Structures are given as structure tokens and as C-alpha cells.
Amino acid sequence: MQHPAFYVTGTDTGIGKTMGSTALLHALRARGHRAVGMKPVASGCEHTPHGWRNEDALALQAASDPQPDYAVLNPYALPAPLAPELAAAEVGVTLALEPIVQAFAQLRTQAEVVVVEGVGGWAAPLSATLDQADLVCALQLPVVLVVGVRLGCINHARLTAAAIAADGLQCIGWIANEVDPQMERIEENIGMLRQRLAMPYWGRIPWRPGADAATQAHGLQLPR
């Protein structure tokens, strides 16, 4: 894999960033890479005997090989299912880059590739003073965009790609994730996206209820 780490963002919240990220981990592992996931900030956690745990972060941990310690994979586990800025304020936490940078450095020593999953859509802030672009710059990562294929996705994808470029960051690929089984003319919409998005197409995750990430990884077309 040309890039030893990248940041996965989406066109919106709820469009399948975690499925995209875990499928990427399985695809990388199928190529023989040691690949681990990371969820720097997760809001909406359940209290367990081991501490606060987030469902998406646990999915990334399960898809990783080797499996990192949870606290390293998810430095900020915030209980409330709110925007990170609000969820952090509820528990008196101030989100900072340094703990994330340190955790990322640990993960880089454990694997050949680190897949870092963001929050919400690209413009969703991390805090009152931090945007996701600040984190991506600090970690020196390229970006992979997951497009939730539903009505309006062409507009959302183009706006997100433009925002990433405006932040001075590189988007190295995009993934089509089918999230609306009722959507008509999916093939044509994906074709229009391929014509209009400048970055390479990394494949498609079909609508397949109940399918696990390892199965969905078969639809990805990662660069060598």
C-alpha cells in the first residue's frame, strides 16, 4: 500500500464511514498487510466493566490485526451521543491534539497501515477550536471519502471534495457506499460521481443487510 495511513471521512453522518473503514481494514489484511483502525474521537459510548466503549470503535478494533488496546485506538470516548464539542463539554473534557498524535504514533509502530476514522461529515468540528482538518494536518494524512449513495449524494460528494481541497489536503480515493435500498438508478449515480470526482474510485459497498465488513471488502478496489 502506497500510503501507510489515511483518514476516512464521509459526506454526512450515518453514511457508513465505519463500514467503509472496517472493509478497508479487511481488504488491506487480505493483501497481507498488518492494518489497524483508529477512532480518535467517539461520542455515544456505553459504560462497560472496562470503561466507556463505542460501537464503531469496537468494530474497528475487531477488524484490526494486530488488535490494539482500546484506549490507544479511541483516546476520546465520550458518553453522550452528541456532536463531539457538546459531548466533551458534558463530561468536562477539553479535546486536544496531543493525546491523539501520541496514540497514532503508537499505532504506527504496531502496523503497516493505520485507518483513521473521523466523525460525522468533513466539516463537523471536533471542538470550539479544532476542525477535522487540523487533526489531519497534525497527523499528516491523506483523506479517503466515503460517499453515502442516496438522493443528493452527488452534491454532497462534490461539496465535500471541494472542502477537503480548500483545506489544502489531498483526497486519494473515494468509496461508494449504498445506504438507501429504495434509491433508483444507483449505477447511473455512481457513474456520474466517477465522472465528477477527481480522485480515484476505490470501489463500492453494496446494500447487503447483515453482511459483515469482511464480505463487503470484496467490492473494494484498492490501489497497489
Curated annotation (Swiss-Prot):
Family: Belongs to the dethiobiotin synthetase family.
Subcellular location: Cytoplasm
GO annotation, cellular component aspect: cytosol
Recorded catalytic activity of this chain's protein: (7R,8S)-7,8-diammoniononanoate + CO2 + ATP = (4R,5S)-dethiobiotin + ADP + phosphate + 3 H(+)
Cofactor entry: Mg(2+)
Entry annotation: catalytic residues: 39
Species annotation: Xanthomonas axonopodis pv. citri (strain 306)
Name the UniProt record assigns to this protein: ATP-dependent dethiobiotin synthetase BioD
Taxonomic lineage of the native organism: Bacteria, Pseudomonadati, Pseudomonadota, Gammaproteobacteria, Lysobacterales
GO molecular function: ATP binding; dethiobiotin synthase activity; magnesium ion binding
Keywords attached to this entry: ATP-binding, Biotin biosynthesis, Cytoplasm, Ligase, Magnesium, Metal-binding, Nucleotide-binding
Quaternary structure and interacting proteins, as annotated: Homodimer.
Binding site for ATP: 56, 117-120, 177-178
